[in-house]
């Protein structure tokens, strides 16, 4: 990474300059200064790490709070949460008893092992009409709702709301819950190491080539390092996607559309070797907040109806985005049903 090289070069130059500064004569250590300073540091450490001060002040470790609280405070908070305590009652024996209590039945595939496995985590996609009192002018998900043949579908509850997409990724790819982690922490930034058991590792053991793709900047949530630690063979981000089409803005302010995203998934599939097993994990970006953005390249085709009609323009934009996602997914399913 060129930025890392430049940063390292600047740091190295700074250290060289420091080494060339005139040296002052060393003086004897003044214990009168060291003792109170050490006591102050020890008291701060005890207060910060040994009490509930951080929680009481509602300071959470994340990339966003670094901008608000500064590097030193946020680093200290992350340091406090680097060690995660075991949940109460967590023992191998208890886990074994639970596995016996809830035995699983592995699925049997009539046609053997699938050649291609494609997983799509669609940003913020939800069916708002399941909520009481919410009606839309038309079905925003006609294709998804029409799927019955060769389909298993239902509703999923996420562990996050209004942000922290990376936690949903972490739970899916590792099978670990974030329920027992300190509030506000993001595993992608703090708790991922090379060699951790993941779905990616299982797929590679079965002979799959594993690809992660996300049509947004690679700087989000430490994804390049995480995907590498998870064992993905290849990773693709916004700049790697060809013929990008944006919604609600341009390349600077908008998001890559689901249709454009899926066309790139099709390209990745078509470029693989015949018979090669492919596991493709994709996180979309089209429906990311906020929902008061310009309607560039987005038609207003679905909106709130009933008692709420005309009251929430943000929901109208969200409904129209979901409608476009549904059409893009129909394109993807139609393509793979014919190959």
Stretches with model-predicted labels:
Residues 100-112, 119-122, 127-339:
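Solvent-exposed soluble domains appended to multi-pass membrane proteins
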Residues 1-115, 135-155, 187-193, 197, ...:
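N-terminal secretory/membrane-targeting segments
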């Amino acid at each position: 990474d060129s930025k890392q090289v430049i940063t390292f070069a600047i740091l190295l130059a700074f250290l060289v300059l420091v080494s060339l500064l005139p040296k002052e004569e060393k003086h004897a250590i003044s214990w009168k200064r060291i003792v109170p300073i050490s006591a102050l540091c020890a008291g701060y450490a005890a207060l910060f790490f040994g009490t509930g001060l951080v929680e009481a002040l509602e300071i959470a470790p994340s990339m966003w709070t670094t901008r608000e609280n500064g590097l030193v405070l946020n680093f200290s908070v992350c340091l406090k949460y680097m060690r995660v305590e075991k949940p109460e009652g967590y023992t191998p024996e208890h886990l074994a008893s639970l596995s016996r209590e809830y035995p699983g039945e592995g699925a049997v595939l009539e046609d053997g092992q699938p050649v291609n496995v494609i997983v799509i985590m669609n940003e913020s996609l939800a069916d708002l009409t399941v909520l009481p009192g919410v009606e839309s002018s038309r079905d925003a998900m006609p294709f998804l709702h029409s799927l019955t043949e060769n389909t298993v579908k239902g509703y999923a509850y996420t562990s996050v709301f209004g942000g922290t997409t990376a936690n949903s990724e972490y739970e899916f790819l590792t099978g670990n819950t974030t329920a027992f982690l300190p509030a506000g922490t993001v595993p992608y930034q703090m708790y991922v190491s090379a060699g951790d058991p993941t779905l990616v590792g299982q797929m590679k053991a079965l002979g799959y080539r594993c690809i992660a793709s996300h049509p947004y900047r690679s700087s989000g949530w430490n994804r390049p390092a995480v995907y590498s630690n998870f064992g993905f063979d290849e990773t693709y981000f916004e700049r790697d996607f060809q013929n990008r089409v944006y919604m609600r803005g341009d390349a600077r302010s908008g998001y890559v559309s689901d249709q454009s995203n899926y066309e790139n998934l099709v390209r990745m599939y078509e470029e693989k070797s015949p018979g090669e097993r492919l596991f493709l994990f994709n996180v979309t970006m089209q429906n990311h907040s906020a929902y008061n953005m310009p309607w560039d390249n987005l038609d207003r085709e679905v909106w709130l109806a009933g008692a709420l009609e005309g009251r929430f323009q943000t929901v109208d934009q969200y409904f129209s985005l979901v409608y476009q996602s549904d059409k893009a997914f129909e394109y993807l399913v139609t393509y793979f049903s014919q190959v």
